[in-house]
Amino acid sequence: MQMDRKTQIIDYDGNMIADLKEWMIRNKLANLGFNYNVVAILGSQSSGKSTLLNNLFKTSFDVMNTKLGHSQTTQGLWLSFDTFEESPVSPLEKGNSTTPINPTLILDVEGNDSKERGDNRLTFEHRSALFSLALADCLIVNLWYHSLGNFTASNYGLLKTVMEVNLELFQQDKNCPKTILLFTVRDWFEEFASIDIVKNKIVEEYLNKIWAEMKKPPSAKKANINNYFIVEVVGLSHAIIKKTEFLNDVENLRKKWINELRPLQYSRNIPSDGFAHYCNNIWNTIVKQSQLDIPSQKEMLATFRCQEIKNNVISNTSKMIKEKLTASSSQPTSASIDEFKSWAEKDIVEKSLDEYFVDASRYTESICLKTSEELLESLFIQLQTIVDNNLNFTQRVLSAKFANELNTMYSVCTSDKNVFLFSKESNLQVHKDGNGSNSSKEDKKDENTSQDKCIRLWSSFLSNADKLEYITFCNFFESYQKCNIEIRKKNKIHEFNYKPSLNILLTSICKDMNRIRNTQFTVLLERTRATIKSRFKNMDNLLITTKNPEEYWNHTLKIVKALQESINNNLTKCFINLKGGGPGSSVAGISNELFDHDEDNTFHVDSPSEGHRSISDNRTAHENKHYVDENLLNYKKIDIIKNKGKYISSVSEEIDKQIKNKKAISELNNYYLDEIMDVLKSKLDEISDNLSSIIIQRFESVFNYDDAEQPRHWREISMAELKKIFRESKNYAFLIIDILQKNIKVELIDDYLPNNFIKDEVIEKGKNKAKRKIQEICRDAQYIQETGGKMSLKNVPLFFWVILLILGWNELLFFIRFFFRLNIILPLFLAAAVILSTLFFNGNMEVLSTINKVVFFLAKSSFGFYRQLQTMGEKVAQVPTAD
């Protein structure tokens, strides 16, 4: 713990050591406010400075071991402290013995006239003396009695430097505290001379002489040394020969410091928590502003005072800036942006400069002006935060406005889900200006349908987004220019940094644009796929009538080519506008982000089926390069706005280049083909899943109907003829498998659908299911043929219905009474009548035939049940007769 009571603050090479603040915190010295003092000691090497401080302030500085010879012990500057815990204030002096004593920081300085430093010693000696003078309330000058009269050993040159610098540092400050110059005369004997004589010699032959030789400013010519220094001289006995007297002298000096010399507060007005930083600044100022190894007193003074004035001005204006910053952070408004320029110019910049130049203009002009620039820079740094808040608010508003306007413009496209009704006219030749403009007649025609309006909007998406982006940038700079400040004293305008907010705006615009763009591309793609799907919706019906694979697949190929041509003619410009662009992309540089080009402007695709994936991969591959290119193009827009030039969009030209690029159009056609074939595959998968149903429909289309497409009358057809029809129908039905397996070569389709693309297990499952149903249909036909007229209600004789009514009369009445009791007979009767009438008039003979069978079965069963009941009744009637 004793070792931690001291620390080196400047090393032998003159470098400031950075841990002074931590040392003060550890020793509880950082929270003293102004309630502390600083003492520094100067003197020749090996003159006993550290020994004196250790005895006077109970420190533990290293001292020289004379038994090992004379050498340099203290290197650089060391700092320790004394809290005077065991030394109460004298009641005679202070009137209150319980008053606490402020801690004192003790600065032990490397000795002068060092042999080890040689000829280079003067630079460090002067720097350390200036540093000590800037910090110390009390500067102890340690010298030997027998050196009085010598030049070097008596520190005459050092005293001259100290007095000159002190005058220049503090002459302008009328309230400047006096520095205590405490001369400790070592090895002093009362027998040689009294202390008054020694003090008189030091004051007259040293201090007054130096003061008289100094060049003083006019305001100080009539002043004397007592206006700037409090001079004290103390004689100390020999530390070895008269050790007891020496210790008594030191103790008396300690009491004198506590009760008489010590200022109540630190005279340099530096709070203890800023002392470490203050030391660092003082030392760096001394080191950096030295000329010929000796600081220029005038520049030192100007630097010190201008910095001090600057800091005071900043401190005075910071409160207002903080209040404005709080307001701008919590709830910025358009009004606060408009008001910023006014109060920032008048209340901050102009007021601060006026306050600064009142005091600083008396010092060196170059340093004064340089420090004023530092003052403005400091103010602008604080104001920049408010400007950032204002610009961030502006960019949020503009970003939301951009997204809302672009989204509203394309909302009609999002709501329309209908399939495309393609026209024969190519969309590639329409709206060449990218804005949907052509002849007035064509425009009027385009606006007649929602489809044409959507296509026109999609074809000009990038151009519309580019215009909105430019308008957004213009609005942003209009708000930004309201933030720039005019400095009237310097006749210039300060422009704040807008790039962070602009970059956020750019990113937000890019994200919103790409989000809307991707949404519109999804809508376009879904409608395109729905259109393709609608063209393929009759493919399963075509399978019912198709008689060979060539007919079916040639018809499918015609549909594919027609779709590809229609999409190319009508939607290519839409796809160029809406497809492409990765995160961070903007409307600028569209030709780069659409496809992957090489030097001859060609594309690289592995295969037609890879087209979609290849285009998507290119978006990621060029993302970083595009971001840089697009930023450059966006900043060109900014330069045009700043220079008030005219902006001409190049987006339409880039899109026209893509349309004229044969390779690009070919690549898009491959992409269209990918989408068409994806839908075709889905349709064929759907057909494969319903294979049995289609086989059955094909079978029934031949089996149940003749060549004239009339229903067959099976009761008029022989069994041999029925079997022949069955074989022909079955062969025709199962021909569908050969058709779907595509065992022929088909242009374009072969690249996507191989031969025999339907799995064997799917085919077998469909065939087995279809066979069972076909056999069931055949059995029904055979049954109808075998029963012939017996199954017809028309062939039932009239007398049969009369007999049925007579024999079942009681049962009929029983059921009628029962159902009428439940109130359901009439609704059931009406429902049955409606169903039978509907079936009859719709010609649904199969259902009527089934109902006919059910009725006959019920009639037969009822008649048998009736005969059984009648027999049982007769037997019961015969039993009483027998009895």
From Swiss-Prot:
| SUPFAM superfamilies per record | P-loop containing nucleoside triphosphate hydrolases
Q: Where are the Cytoplasmic topological domains?
A: 1-795, 841-883
Entry-linked Gene3D superfamilies: P-loop containing nucleotide triphosphate hydrolases
Question: Matching InterPro entries, A to Z?
Answer: G_GB1_RHD3_dom (IPR030386), P-loop_NTPase (IPR027417), RHD3/Sey1 (IPR008803), Sey1/RHD3-like_3HB (IPR046758)
Return one GO MF term.
Answer: GTPase activity
Segments crossing the lipid bilayer? 796-816, 820-840
EC numbers for this chain: 3.6.5.-
- Tell me the compartments it is located in: Endoplasmic reticulum membrane
Instruction: Cite the GB1/RHD3-type G domain residue spans from the record.
Output: 33-279
Q: Which residues form a coiled coil?
A: 673-693
Q: Which UniProt keywords apply?
A: Coiled coil, Endoplasmic reticulum, GTP-binding, Hydrolase, Membrane, Nucleotide-binding, Transmembrane, Transmembrane helix
Membrane topology is: Multi-pass membrane protein
Q: Where does GTP bind?
A: 43-50
For side Lumenal, which residue ranges?
817-819
Please provide the Gene Ontology terms (biological process) for this protein.
endoplasmic reticulum membrane fusion
What GO CC annotations are associated with the protein?
endoplasmic reticulum membrane
EC class: hydrolase
Pfam families linked to this entry:
RHD3_GTPase (PF05879), Sey1_3HB (PF20428)
What family is this? Belongs to the TRAFAC class dynamin-like GTPase superfamily. GB1/RHD3 GTPase family. RHD3 subfamily.
What task does this protein carry out? Probable GTP-binding protein involved in generating and maintaining the structure of the tubular endoplasmic reticulum network.
What HAMAP family does this protein map onto?
Answer: Sey1
Its protein name is Protein SEY1 homolog
Organism for this UniProt entry? Plasmodium knowlesi (strain H)
